[in-house]
C-alpha cells in the first residue's frame, strides 16, 4: 500500500515510519509512506501557508496555492489511482467497517489540515472523501492521519505476523474483543480462567465468544442492535447476562 501525506509537520510521521508494526511494514516494503509539506510550494521569502478567511472571524485558513500544488505533486507521484482524503471533524466517523473499506485502496493521499481548516473549494475540487476519528476537535490532522494509517495498514497482507489477528480484533466481527491472559497463572490472587488452560479448543472458542458478547453488552450495547446474532451467540449472551445478574 502507498500512502501520501500532505502536512505542515511531516516529521511527525516518523512515529509511523520508524516504529512498531507500521515501521516494520515500511522496512519490508509492504507499506510506503511519502510526505509533502505545503511550505515547500510557497513563493515568498516567509514561506507563508496561511491566509485570512473571507467574512472575518477568528483564526486563519491554509493558503490555497501551496496546498493545491502539494496535492497535485503528490498525486503525480502516486503509483496509481489514488483516493484523496481530508481529515476533518465534518467527515464520516472512522470505524472498523470504514477501516476495512479504506484498506481496499492500494493508494491513499491524506490531507492534514491546520489552523481553522482549508478553503471549501479545495475540498470540492481535490478531495474524494472526508473522514473524522471522533466528535472532537484537534489542533491538526496529523494524529488522525496517523490513526488512519495504523488501522488501515493492519489489513495489508503480510503486515501482521498472523493475519487472523486483524480478523479477531475488537470490532472486526462487530463485537468488542474478549479478555486475554498470559503468564503467570496467578496474579495478585487472580487466576487465569481454567478453560483457557484446558486444551479444549471448542470450549475455548465458546468462552471467548461468550466473553466478547458479554463485554459488548456491558460496555457498548448499541453495537448489538446492528447485529443479527446466530442461535449460538444468542444462547451464549443469555448465559452471560444470567450469570452477570446472579453476581
Swiss-Prot record:
Specifically methylates guanosine-37 in various tRNAs. The keyword Cytoplasm applies. It holds the Pfam family tRNA_m1G_MT. It comes from the Bacteria. One of its GO terms (molecular function) is tRNA (guanine(37)-N1)-methyltransferase activity. It is found in: Cytoplasm. The keyword tRNA processing applies. GO terms for biological process: tRNA N1-guanine methylation. S-adenosyl-L-methionine binds at residues 113, 133-138. InterPro entries: Alpha/beta_knot_MTases, tRNA_m1G_MeTrfase_C_sf, tRNA_m1G_MeTrfase_TrmD, tRNA_m1G_MTases_N, tRNA_MeTrfase_TRMD/TRM10. Homodimer. SUPFAM superfamilies: alpha/beta knot. Keywords: Cytoplasm, Methyltransferase, S-adenosyl-L-methionine, Transferase, tRNA processing. It catalyses: guanosine(37) in tRNA + S-adenosyl-L-methionine = N(1)-methylguanosine(37) in tRNA + S-adenosyl-L-homocysteine + H(+). Belongs to the RNA methyltransferase TrmD family. Coiled coil: none annotated. Its main location: cytoplasm. It comes from Vibrio campbellii (strain ATCC BAA-1116). This is tRNA (guanine-N(1)-)-methyltransferase. The lineage of its organism: Bacteria, Pseudomonadati, Pseudomonadota, Gammaproteobacteria, Vibrionales. GO terms for cellular component: cytosol. Its EC number is 2.1.1.228.
Amino acid at each position: 500500500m502507498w500512502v501520501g501525506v500532505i502536512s505542515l509537520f511531516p516529521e511527525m510521521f516518523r512515529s509511523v515510519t520508524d516504529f512498531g508494526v507500521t515501521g516494520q511494514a515500511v522496512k519490508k516494503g509492504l507499506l510506503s509512506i511519502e510526505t509533502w509539506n505545503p511550505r515547500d510550494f510557497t513563493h515568498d521569502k516567509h514561506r507563508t501557508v496561511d491566509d485570512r478567511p473571507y467574512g472575518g472571524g477568528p483564526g486563519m485558513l491554509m493558503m490555497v496555492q501551496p496546498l493545491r500544488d502539494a496535492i497535485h505533486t503528490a498525486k503525480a507521484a502516486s503509483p496509481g489511482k489514488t483516493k484523496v482524503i481530508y481529515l476533518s471533524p465534518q467527515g464520516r466517523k472512522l470505524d472498523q467497517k470504514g477501516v476495512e473499506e479504506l484498506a481496499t485502496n492500494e493508494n491513499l493521499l491524506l490531507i492534514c489540515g491546520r489552523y481553522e481548516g482549508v478553503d471549501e473549494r479545495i475540498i470540492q475540487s481535490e478531495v474524494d472523501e472526508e473522514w473524522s476519528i471522533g466528535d472532537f476537535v484537534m489542533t491538526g490532522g496529523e494524529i488522525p492521519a496517523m490513526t488512519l494509517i495504523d488501522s488501515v495498514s493492519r489489513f495489508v497482507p503480510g503486515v501482521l505476523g498472523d493475519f487472523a489477528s486483524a480478523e479477531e480484533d475488537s470490532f472486526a466481527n462487530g463485537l468488542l474483543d474478549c479478555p486475554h491472559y498470559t503468564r503467570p497463572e496467578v496474579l495478585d490472587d487472580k487466576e487465569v480462567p481454567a478453560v483457557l488452560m484446558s486444551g479444549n479448543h471448542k470450549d475455548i472458542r465458546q468462552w471467548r465468544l461468550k466473553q466478547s458478547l458479554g463485554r459488548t453488552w456491558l460496555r457498548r450495547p448499541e453495537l448489538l442492535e446492528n447485529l443479527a446474532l446466530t442461535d449460538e451467540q444468542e444462547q451464549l449472551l443469555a448465559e452471560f447476562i444470567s450469570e452477570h445478574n446472579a453476581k
